[in-house]
């Protein structure tokens, strides 16, 4: 169906069409000329009247025109972003359309050949079309950012993607900041308690958690020797069955204290020893709810074909950072081990999802998670570790990490500084697409990157089940409290009557 014709000057990047009828933003169109079959996306629509242009400033003239003839002539113009030449392996057109070239609405079958055939995971359908959009699972190794304003559908997107990846036999690990997924109706759910086991930590990692500075060489040496001796000793006793599981945590604490005292006996080391002891005791107090030597390694906890969810809701931000960074390190190191030997390490690829990523990957603060996330962003693809970051504050994210997220699912974004920040950190997001972000409805998204063949404007599927991130039924909850109070008052009155 013809919707309009090219007018004015066009380029291989964009064209302007004069439409025969009103057209919607996000409509896919086809322009055929000079053996080119160009697919385009309408990114801007304007309507006006030659009789009532911007120079009109007399309201009485407008009123008289309306009285004289109610059908004032109007026009509709639409800007078309050229996406590809469907006759040339989906490369960009190398010839611009000429004035008068007809633009027709793309047919479903044409769009299905682009968005429905090569992917493995259905994410939704093109807005206004009966065309499903499937994502390329292999390209998740190039990392993904899911960005949106609060309430625009981030959690729903994560739930839909995670469940469908698990249904393909894949493994997803979600660091659940608000507990949205831990008690959800996601199928194939594997709940993981957040624990840190020093037996699976390196001396450097342990010293970082104790906040021993890199230039504090004597302090690090004291801690390193004590940590290695104690953890090796505990491992040997465990093998020989000489230590009960129930006393592991208390024994680690006492053995570390004793060994630190021994390591720092000389006068030269005395002040450094005291400093390390203080930091160790502070560490054990701060992380008492997550330190657990009876806990198995995260590598043993994550399962293939599962949505593995680590609940962070009971932790403060320091503990969250410690847990997330440790798990990221173990996953990356373990995948490296498997790639090298095939006999040890994590045997399957995994996608790690960091919710509230602006907290852990802030552009203004250095965190342990930020270090290991940046390592995965650089190295993870080679070892089958994909990183997905989720945030409603894109401008708060570290720009180096965000720029390495080759794929992006961007839902409604209103804040201009957020849009600008996303645009500056994305090689494959154009300004005209970025301008559409504020006009998206809840659950609608622009998808760019290697996970789709071409940029897609998509209505994300609705997750079928409970997610705690949904808006609460406030009236319903108020009524429940009111009923409870009435029942309690009834019992109180009943007791008073008996007493009388």
UniProtKB/Swiss-Prot annotation:
One of its GO terms (molecular function) is helicase activity. Pfam families: DUF87, HAS-barrel. ATP binds at residues 142, 151-156, 459-460. Keywords: ATP-binding, DNA damage, DNA repair, DNA-binding, Helicase, Hydrolase, Isomerase, Nucleotide-binding. It comes from the Archaea. SUPFAM superfamilies: P-loop containing nucleoside triphosphate hydrolases (SSF52540). ATPase activity is stimulated in the presence of linear double-stranded (ds)DNA. Helicase activity requires the presence of NurA. LhrC-Core (Hel112) inhibits the exonuclease activity of the HerA-NurA complex on ss- and dsDNA, has no effect on the nicking activity of NurA. Signal peptide: none annotated. GO terms for biological process: DNA repair. It catalyses: Couples ATP hydrolysis with the unwinding of duplex DNA at the replication fork by translocating in the 5'-3' direction. This creates two antiparallel DNA single strands (ssDNA). The leading ssDNA polymer is the template for DNA polymerase III holoenzyme which synthesizes a continuous strand; ATP + H2O = ADP + phosphate + H(+); Couples ATP hydrolysis with the unwinding of duplex DNA by translocating in the 3'-5' direction. The keyword Hydrolase applies. Its EC number is 5.6.2.3, 5.6.2.4. Homohexamer. Forms a complex with NurA. PANTHER family: HELICASE MJ1565-RELATED. Involved in DNA double-strand break (DSB) repair. Probably acts with NurA to stimulate resection of the 5' strand and produce the long 3' single-strand that is required for RadA loading. NurA and HerA together stimulate the end-resection of six nucleotides of a linear DNA substrate. Has DNA-dependent ATPase activity and bidirectional DNA helicase activity. Preferentially binds single stranded (ss)DNA, bubble and semiforked DNA substrate over other DNA molecules tested. Stimulates the exo- but not endonuclease activity of NurA. Contains an N-terminal HAS-barrel domain, which mediates interaction with NurA, followed by a central RecA-like catalytic core and a C-terminal four-helix bundle. Belongs to the HerA family. This is DNA double-strand break repair helicase HerA. It comes from Saccharolobus solfataricus (strain ATCC 35092 / DSM 1617 / JCM 11322 / P2). The gene is herA.
């Amino acid at each position: 169906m013809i919707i309009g014709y090219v007018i004015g000057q066009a380029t291989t990047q964009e064209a302007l069409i004069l439409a025969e009828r009103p057209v919607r933003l996000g409509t896919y169109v086809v322009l055929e000329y000079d053996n080119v079959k160009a697919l385009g996306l309408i990114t801007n629509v304007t309507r006006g009247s030659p009789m009532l242009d911007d120079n009109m400033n007399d309201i009485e003239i407008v009123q008289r025109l309306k009285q004289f003839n109610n059908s004032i002539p109007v026009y509709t113009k639409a800007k078309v972003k050229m996406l590809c030449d469907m006759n040339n392996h989906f490369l960009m057109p190398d010839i611009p359309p000429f004035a008068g070239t007809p633009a027709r609405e793309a047919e479903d079958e044409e769009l299905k050949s682009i968005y429905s055939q090569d992917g493995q995971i259905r994410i939704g359908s093109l807005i206004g079309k009966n065309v499903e959009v499937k994502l390329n699972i292999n390209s998740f190794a190039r990392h993904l950012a899911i960005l949106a304003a609060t309430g625009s559908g981030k959690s729903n997107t994560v739930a839909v993607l995670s469940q469908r990846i698990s249904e393909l036999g894949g493994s997803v690990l979600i660091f659940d900041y608000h507990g949205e997924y831990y008690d959800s109706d996601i199928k194939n759910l594997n709940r993981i308690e957040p624990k840190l086991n020093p037996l699976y930590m390196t001396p450097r990692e342990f010293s970082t958690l104790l906040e021993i500075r890199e230039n504090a060489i004597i302090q690090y040496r004291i801690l390193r020797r004590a940590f290695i001796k104690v953890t090796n000793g505990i491992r040997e006793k465990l093998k020989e069955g000489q230590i009960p599981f129930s006393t592991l945590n208390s024994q680690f604490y006492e053995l570390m204290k004793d060994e630190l005292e021994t390591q720092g006996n000389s006068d030269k080391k005395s002040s450094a020893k005291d400093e390390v002891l203080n930091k160790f005791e502070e560490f054990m107090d701060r992380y008492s709810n997550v330190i657990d030597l009876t806990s198995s390694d995260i590598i043993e906890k994550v399962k293939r074909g599962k949505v593995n969810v680590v609940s962070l809701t009971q932790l403060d931000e320091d503990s969250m950072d410690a847990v997330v960074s440790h798990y990221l390190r173990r996953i990356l190191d373990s995948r490296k081990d498997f790639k090298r030997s095939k006999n040890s390490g994590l045997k399957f690829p995994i996608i790690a999802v960091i919710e509230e990523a602006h907290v852990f990957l802030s552009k203004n603060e250095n965190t342990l998670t930020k270090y290991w996330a940046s390592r995965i962003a650089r190295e993870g693809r080679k070892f089958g570790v994909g990183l997905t970051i989720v945030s409603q504050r894109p401008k708060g994210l570290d720009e180096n990490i965000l720029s390495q997220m080759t794929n992006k699912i961007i839902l409604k974004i209103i804040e201009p500084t957020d849009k600008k920040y996303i645009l500056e950190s994305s090689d494959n997001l154009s300004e005209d697409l970025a301008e559409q972000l504020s006009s998206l409805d809840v659950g609608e998204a622009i998808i760019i990157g290697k996970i789709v063949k071409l940029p897609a404007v998509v209505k994300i599927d609705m997750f079928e089940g409970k997610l705690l991130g949904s808006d609460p039924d406030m009236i319903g909850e108020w009524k429940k409290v009111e009923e409870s109070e009435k029942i309690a008052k009834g019992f109180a009155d009943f007791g008073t009557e008996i007493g009388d």
